[in-house]
């Protein structure tokens, strides 16, 4: 009787875990890296027949990239060649991934694995200006929420959306490595740091006007120097031998 009860309990736990595991899998598929699906689903704008090919100039760049690796290791170039495809096209449809696999002579799955792992690869179309707002702890403590709210209000979109004119895409990201200059955002390849809501509004206005705002801190400080100014290293360092006894 004890054995029957134990088996029944084990069966119930197994069924419960099975349901939980299925839900975890569903969540992971829905909320993969960058909020995108880990798996590919054909759409009218993203399928194996979506036109994509590298330009002649980029084919030359690919060969230059491949030469950085030992002979027979073309697969090592998957990351930079995917980046090249994204810079040419703005995002990575499945056809671009297939082209990368073809050019590097690797199975397509090897390219898919990389493209779905790294959040920097855009697997759906983005606007001309891809705005990535860091909301990890240091930025959050420096009020990154106000930056995100200002952007949503100014652009009229929510996180994960693109403006109707295809000019701006807004996403929320994890740490971008500029914690000392929090709060900050990355727009395309540029970092804008030490932001206030007024700063980010001005940046958007400049981009809309076709200008390129100056990257870096908006607070006036240089790079990541102390906010109150330098307290050490206030003059050029002395040369070799400084302070050494003359007799040595």
From Swiss-Prot:
<dbReference type="GO" id="GO:0005743">
    <property type="term" value="C:mitochondrial inner membrane"/>
</dbReference>
<keyword id="KW-0597">Phosphoprotein</keyword>
<keyword id="KW-1278">Translocase</keyword>
<dbReference type="GO" id="GO:0045271">
    <property type="term" value="C:respiratory chain complex I"/>
</dbReference>
<keyword id="KW-0999">Mitochondrion inner membrane</keyword>
<dbReference type="GO" id="GO:0005739">
    <property type="term" value="C:mitochondrion"/>
</dbReference>
<keyword id="KW-0472">Membrane</keyword>
<keyword id="KW-0809">Transit peptide</keyword>
<dbReference type="GO" id="GO:0006120">
    <property type="term" value="P:mitochondrial electron transport, NADH to ubiquinone"/>
</dbReference>
<dbReference type="GO" id="GO:0046872">
    <property type="term" value="F:metal ion binding"/>
</dbReference>
<feature type="region of interest" description="Disordered">
    <location>
        <begin position="229"/>
        <end position="248"/>
    </location>
</feature>
<feature type="binding site">
    <location>
        <position position="179"/>
    </location>
    <ligand>
        <name>[2Fe-2S] cluster</name>
    </ligand>
</feature>
<protein>
    <recommendedName>
        <fullName>NADH dehydrogenase [ubiquinone] flavoprotein 2, mitochondrial</fullName>
        <ecNumber>7.1.1.2</ecNumber>
    </recommendedName>
</protein>
<feature type="binding site">
    <location>
        <position position="139"/>
    </location>
    <ligand>
        <name>[2Fe-2S] cluster</name>
    </ligand>
</feature>
<keyword id="KW-0813">Transport</keyword>
<dbReference type="GO" id="GO:0048738">
    <property type="term" value="P:cardiac muscle tissue development"/>
</dbReference>
<feature type="binding site">
    <location>
        <position position="134"/>
    </location>
    <ligand>
        <name>[2Fe-2S] cluster</name>
    </ligand>
</feature>
<keyword id="KW-0001">2Fe-2S</keyword>
<dbReference type="InterPro" id="IPR042128">
    <property type="entry name" value="NuoE_dom"/>
</dbReference>
<keyword id="KW-0560">Oxidoreductase</keyword>
<keyword id="KW-0830">Ubiquinone</keyword>
<keyword id="KW-0408">Iron</keyword>
<keyword id="KW-0520">NAD</keyword>
<dbReference type="InterPro" id="IPR036249">
    <property type="entry name" value="Thioredoxin-like_sf"/>
</dbReference>
<keyword id="KW-0249">Electron transport</keyword>
<dbReference type="Pfam" id="PF01257">
    <property type="entry name" value="2Fe-2S_thioredx"/>
</dbReference>
<keyword id="KW-0411">Iron-sulfur</keyword>
<feature type="modified residue" description="Phosphotyrosine; by SRC">
    <location>
        <position position="192"/>
    </location>
</feature>
<dbReference type="GO" id="GO:0051537">
    <property type="term" value="F:2 iron, 2 sulfur cluster binding"/>
</dbReference>
<dbReference type="InterPro" id="IPR002023">
    <property type="entry name" value="NuoE-like"/>
</dbReference>
<keyword id="KW-0479">Metal-binding</keyword>
<comment type="subunit">
    <text>Core subunit of respiratory chain NADH dehydrogenase (Complex I) which is composed of 45 different subunits. This is a component of the flavoprotein-sulfur (FP) fragment of the enzyme.</text>
</comment>
<comment type="similarity">
    <text>Belongs to the complex I 24 kDa subunit family.</text>
</comment>
<keyword id="KW-0496">Mitochondrion</keyword>
<keyword id="KW-0679">Respiratory chain</keyword>
<dbReference type="GO" id="GO:0008137">
    <property type="term" value="F:NADH dehydrogenase (ubiquinone) activity"/>
</dbReference>
<comment type="function">
    <text>Core subunit of the mitochondrial membrane respiratory chain NADH dehydrogenase (Complex I) which catalyzes electron transfer from NADH through the respiratory chain, using ubiquinone as an electron acceptor. Parts of the peripheral arm of the enzyme, where the electrons from NADH are accepted by flavin mononucleotide (FMN) and then passed along a chain of iron-sulfur clusters by electron tunnelling to the final acceptor ubiquinone. Contains one iron-sulfur cluster.</text>
</comment>
<dbReference type="InterPro" id="IPR041921">
    <property type="entry name" value="NuoE_N"/>
</dbReference>
<dbReference type="GO" id="GO:0007399">
    <property type="term" value="P:nervous system development"/>
</dbReference>
<feature type="binding site">
    <location>
        <position position="175"/>
    </location>
    <ligand>
        <name>[2Fe-2S] cluster</name>
    </ligand>
</feature>
<feature type="transit peptide" description="Mitochondrion">
    <location>
        <begin position="1"/>
        <end position="31"/>
    </location>
</feature>
